[in-house]
Amino acid sequence: MPHIRQLCWVSLLCLSSSAVAANVRLKVEGLSGELEKNVRAQLSTIQSDEVTPDRRFRARVDDAIREGLKALGYYEPTIKFDLLPPPAKGRQVLIARVTPGQPVLIGGTEVILRGGARTDKDYLALLKTRPAIGTVLNQGDYDNFKKSLTSVSLRKGYFDSEFIKSQLGIALGRHQAFWDIDYDSGERYRFGPVTFEGSQIRDEYLQNLLPFKEGDEYESKDLAELNRRLSATGWFNSVVVAPEFEKSRKTKILPLKGVVSPRTENTIETGVGYSTDVGPRVKASWKKPWMNSYGHSLTTSTSISAPEQVLDFSYKMPLLKNPLEQYYLVQGGFKRTDLNDTEQDSTTLAVSRYWDLSSGWQRAINLRWSFDHFTQGNVTNTTMLFYPGVMISRTRSRGGLMPTWGDSQRYSVDYSNTAWGSDVDFSVLQAQNVWIRTLYDRHRFVMRANLGWIETGDFDKVPPDLRFFAGGDRSIRGYKYKSISPKDSDGNLKGASKLATGSLEYQYNVTGKWWGAVFVDSGEAVSDIRRSDFKTGTGVGVRWASPVGPVKLDFAVPVGDKDEHGLQFYIGLGPEL
């Protein structure tokens, strides 16, 4: 019986405490700005059902408020508690009335730097961030300053650094605070030799990927860049490059060890897709990310749709002196086209030399050979071409698969001459630009411009793949794919020697990953610029930022065209740049 009575009393006390807690609300008055924000952060650990009017809880709140104020230089606040009766159908309110009091001011910030830090510009720059004498103490500034010293040491290779002394002195009677820091960075480490384990690629190729030389001063960004460059080659499944500290304490020369594992030798990918331009499409590819110890790689692919069937390959050969940014590319393939008034069988082979520059620009010179049998309208021809060319391009983006900012630029010149065996003389100049900009997160603008010019004395021998046609998803919407060009006397498309198209599209973020779009496209594909024939299409669309890239659905109509009146729709998936 006594035990039962005790249990009953305990149960009643718990129920009573819970009932009181559920009927009391805590309120803090007298603070604003950063003081209020910091105190609220200290009190955030208190749950609403923990609030009670008893002395123990008040002491807990008192401690939390003092800690929050102390961090910002207020060491002597006055805190008074009042318990207000509940309003009608409300709860009791426990009010903490706070007077912050006189703040503690910075009286001095003595920082002594030893070792390499005495002359290192990054450490010296930190000294300028110390608070001015007479400003209110903020303990966060002191803690962050110490963290910054440590951060510079780790970033720049002062791995023996230590605080000989670090003290924040408070003289409450004078309401002053004093920094007293004595920091020895020690000697800066330098990069030593780099060794690799597990690589199937020759060591000299890997050594030429290093963004630093042996003996250079250590920088953590250089180590991160080496990891990035090794991954960017596509040769490895995993890459880890780490310092070997145990071998460097005496000499301050830091060797690095890279542990890599080869990527799978063969990768096969298949896919089924649909685009309005070519309809349903089946794709397959076979990739060999490395074929030998020189890092050569091979990609073959095929794409089959009703109007186009393509089989091609690409063989990449990195150069020893700069394997990531400089390489040869051998490309070739076969393409069969039966679209509108074009029938073509084309076999191509090209050898290109690439330079990928640190600025983001890519440069290339190439030598192409092609053999084409084609019928364009009523004209049938067979041509063999052998022509060099140059190309420069750059793509930049920020914001993931559906960029908030970005641009893509590509400029090329190709030249063919019968003097070296081509069947036709020509010069081809092309420029393609895409720009993406976003304002205030919800307003997205996509602008496109394409220009092309063919100069030749025998246009009928130029293969359709080199001629210009407009119309379609990435050209002038409202018109069918490649349906705009000059026509012959029978009304068949001939292709054009001049191209100019542009597009302006505005997208608005309706909700989440969904965007609405309105656009206008305009341009022409002509052979005589004196006979301008601009076409314009306009429409609306929907965009979904899917995990694999933007999915689009557009509806467009021609504007002011007496021959074209129908509604065209476009479905697509893929990058906009």
Curated annotation (Swiss-Prot):
Signal peptide: 1-21
Mutant phenotype after disruption: Significantly reduced survival in human serum, probably due to complement-mediated killing.
Segments passing through the bilayer: 265-276, 279-288, 297-306, 309-317, 327-336, 347-356, 361-370, 387-395, 406-415, 428-437, 444-453, 500-508, 514-523, 536-545, 549-557, 568-577
Cellular component, GO annotation: cell outer membrane; TAM protein secretion complex
Domain POTRA positions: 187-263
Pfam families assigned: Omp85, POTRA, POTRA_TamA_1
UniProt-listed GO biological process terms: protein secretion
Domain of life: Bacteria
UniProt subcellular location: Cell outer membrane
Keywords, ordered alphabetically: Cell outer membrane, Membrane, Signal, Transmembrane, Transmembrane beta strand, Virulence
Family of the protein in this entry: Belongs to the TamA family.
Oligomer and partners: Interacts with TamB to form the translocation and assembly module (TAM).
Cited function: Component of the translocation and assembly module (TAM), which facilitates the insertion and assembly of specific beta-barrel proteins into the outer membrane.
Database matches in PANTHER family: SORTING AND ASSEMBLY MACHINERY SAMM50 PROTEIN FAMILY MEMBER, TRANSLOCATION AND ASSEMBLY MODULE SUBUNIT TAMA
Name of the molecule in the record: Translocation and assembly module subunit TamA
